[in-house]
Every structure is written in C-alpha cells, then in structure tokens.
Amino acid sequence: MVNFYDDVDESKSHGEFPLIPVVLQNSSELSVRTIPTGNEIIESVHLTKWLRKYRNALASQLDRYEKGWQSKIANFRLQVQHVINYSRKNIFNVDSENKHTVVPGSLIALGAFFSGSIAVNRSNWGAKRLIFGHKSSILEKLCTSLPSRILLPWVLAAATFKYWAPQTSQNLVNATENDLLPADFVKSYHNTWKRIYEEGYVAKKCDLKRQIDQTLQKNIRYAREQLYEKLEQA
C-alpha cells in the first residue's frame, strides 16, 4: 500500500490522517485553500481560473443584456408618452367630442368594420351551400371583389367615426398626412383626388345640372310661348 501521508505512524495517530495528501500539496497544478468554514479544499489552478473567467464573462454579458433591456424599456415608455402627448395635443383636442362622441363613435366604427368584414366574405353569400347552382348577383360580385374586400371594412369604419367625431377624424387625417406619410405621396394623392373628384365628378355634376336647368328653362319658355299664341288665336 502506498503511503501518501508522509510516514504517518498509524499506530499513534488513532485513525487521524492529514486531510490533504502530501503528493497533492506539492503539485503546481493544484492549490490548497481554507474556506470560511475552516475546511481545506483542493482546487485545480487552471480550472479555477477558467471557471472564474467564464463566470465573470457570463456576469458581464448578463449585465449588458440587463442594461440594454432596461434602456429599451425606458425608450419604449418615452415613445408611448410621446405618442400620448402628441395625440392629446394634435388629435384629441376637442373637449366636447372627447366627452360625448369619441368613445361611442369608436365602438360603432369598430362594429361597422366587422359588418364590412362580414359583407365581403364570400361564404356569407351562400356560395358554399350552393356550389353548383349558385348564381352571383351584381351586389354580391361588387361586395366580394378584391378592392371591396380590402377597402370596404376600413371605409365603413372611417365614415362612421367621421360622422360621430368629425373634427377628431379630420385631426387624425391631418396628423397622418403631416407626420407619417411622405410629402410627395400626400401631394400626389391630393392632386389625383382633385382631378378625379373636383375636376371630374363635381365638374360634370355641375355641368349636368346647368344643362338640365337650361333645358328646363327653354322648355318652359317654349311652353309659355305656345300657350300665349293659343290664347291670342282664341
């Protein structure tokens, strides 16, 4: 049997041996230290350095993640507060609408959006129940077309909210145009709307109204002249 304990007399030691073998105490790869409890422990020098380095790196990485997360939370809170302050100043700045019409108008607009979503769903027009004998009506084709499926729910919601809170809805449109959309895009669609609606629809409507008015005036004048001639002949 190999004695690692440097010629300890077992007959006089009463079963007590050194806790740290001499062979391990003299090794440069190992170190012996006393922990706060009073016990001596053996630890690998290189392993301890590697573990300490890994632990410090992990703690530093976690600290960076925590600081980054806290910074993101702080920035998010600032952004939310900025949005709230901006909305109060530029959109929801009409006290009468804020107190009476904005909330019910928003709920009814939400209902209008869901109603539009139901109206543009093909399955709600009986297409699945009558696959072979179903004949699509003009209204069904109009409601279930691709542009209607994209625009109709939003148009209904916007029109409903505008009816209930006209000034707030206009503020929302102005804020979107001024601060969210590119200026060139806003100018382009304003010109397109002016050309289609004002110079197109409105101009043709006024022209048609003027033509009808002129035609009515001519017909009335002709009828009066005919009546006057008949009365003179009589």
Curated annotation (Swiss-Prot):
Keywords: Membrane, Mitochondrion, Mitochondrion inner membrane, Transmembrane, Transmembrane helix. The chain crosses the membrane at residues 101-120, 142-161. Residues 121-141 are mitochondrial matrix. Residues 1-100, 162-234 are mitochondrial intermembrane. It is a multi-pass membrane protein. It is found in: Mitochondrion inner membrane. GO terms for cellular component: mitochondrial inner membrane. Component of the MICOS complex, a large protein complex of the mitochondrial inner membrane that plays crucial roles in the maintenance of crista junctions, inner membrane architecture, and formation of contact sites to the outer membrane. Belongs to the apolipoprotein O/MICOS complex subunit Mic27 family. Component of the mitochondrial contact site and cristae organizing system (MICOS) complex. This is MICOS complex subunit MIC27. The gene is MIC27.
